[in-house]
Amino acid sequence: MPRRRRKIERAWGFLCEGVDAFRLEANEAVRRVITGRRNHIVGGHFSMKMRGHVVHEGGIEERFVRASDCVLHAKRVWAQPETIRMNIFPEFEGEIYTPDYLVEHDAGFIRYEVKQWTELRPPKPADWDEDGKRKWEEAKLLRARLRRVREAYRRASLSFRVITERGIAKYWGDPDVVDEVIANDRWDVEPEELNRLVTALVEAGGSLPMWRCEALFEQVPFPRGVVLSRIPERIIRIDLFSPVGPHTIVHIGVVSC
């Protein structure tokens, strides 16, 4: 017999007037846990910042999670951290919403809805294009729904943003550069070796070219991987919009050793 899934009842808590929220401990993914039917979750990225897997539902969400692991201003990220119930719009009483991600930035927490640009702004359809008309109308409804969500979070004094693949590539990092960092983020170092890198950066005024940093780890098979692995740890940062090379400038991050 198939194993029966454990059902978890939502325990709503007050968020603000007209808005309730349901959360689990440690920001565990609420939607997947509650229903047990999120069968379109396609994978999980092992986040070095979180030291565990962060679930994603498709390419654009995976892109967001990977970028979150690389940008300095993102400290931690959780998938589907809460569900809110809105009773502030009479025609949409009891509307339910679950944000895709909660990110702890240096400046505070932000909830994110991750969407493809064409889901929000599809091309204007021709008169004969019935499928295009359907997508056009669906996008209008989606934008209206997200405006209601933004208003609910605004009333609760919480930050909410919608981000697309365009925004990720423009403000967070070039996808190819992010992928290179993620592909080389598993190199561990001894504390004294790490201290050598941090000390060299401090003594150089906070920045060194990549080749100088690599020279500190000549004894390992891939010195650049050791350096890039320090990015998710927020020990260093680089320009995520330029290809990584010997002359890439490595800056000290926000974590001291």
Model-derived segments and spans:
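Electrostatic, structured charged patches in enzyme active sites and in nucleic-acid/phosphate-binding
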Residues: 1-257
